Amino acid sequence: INRNNKVEFLGSAVDNKYTGIGVHRLYDCLHVLLQNAHKHARSDCPILVNVVTEANAISSQLDSLQITVTSSTTDDKYFDQKQRIHQAICASEAGIDMVTEGYSGIKKIKFITRASEGLSTLSCNPNDDALELALTFSLHVEVASEFSEKGADQRKYY
């Protein structure tokens, strides 16, 4: 990622630790959103990454993680960016697209979250007054456990 902006991480789950395939999915989705934010955001405004968990009735070993990446843009680019994001989120894609071109950007996040969660969890919440675009996705991820000194398995997962 070519970083131009300061990135601020916040939220109740920002220090939580996870393991398993969910970490790779999380990384891929977050990478796309941060890369796009750095590319299109105003250089004088920080990019905000808010990380929270939602109540999860499925398993105590899984967190339902919700990540929102918010960036500000200039008024001459805002409405075009908002429209392009909306079109990409609403567009349907054929599975053959993944084979022939590989997904990138919003298509990649939609594919990853749909494969993991059963449907795409990507959404955009624009704030026209502040010229902010907030993109959110949710994933279930396995909570990392740390084993005690007495345990047979001394690994720590981060």
Regions found by a protein language model. Name each.
Residues 2-15:
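Conserved transmitter core of two-component histidine kinases
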Residues 5-7, 61-67, 131:
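Short beta-strand element(s) in the Bergerat
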Residues 15-23:
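Conserved catalytic segment of the transmitter module in two-component histidine kinases
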Residues 22-52, 110-112:
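Conserved ATP-binding N-box helix of the HATPase_c
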Residues 56-108, 146-148:
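Glycine-rich/acidic phosphate-handling loop/turn and adjacent ATP-lid/helix
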Residues 106-121:
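Conserved glycine-/histidine-rich ATP-lid loop and adjacent helix of the Bergerat-fold HATPase_c
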Residues 120-128:
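Short hydrophobic beta-strand elements within the C-terminal catalytic ATPase subdomain
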Residues 127-158:
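C-terminal end segment of the histidine kinase catalytic
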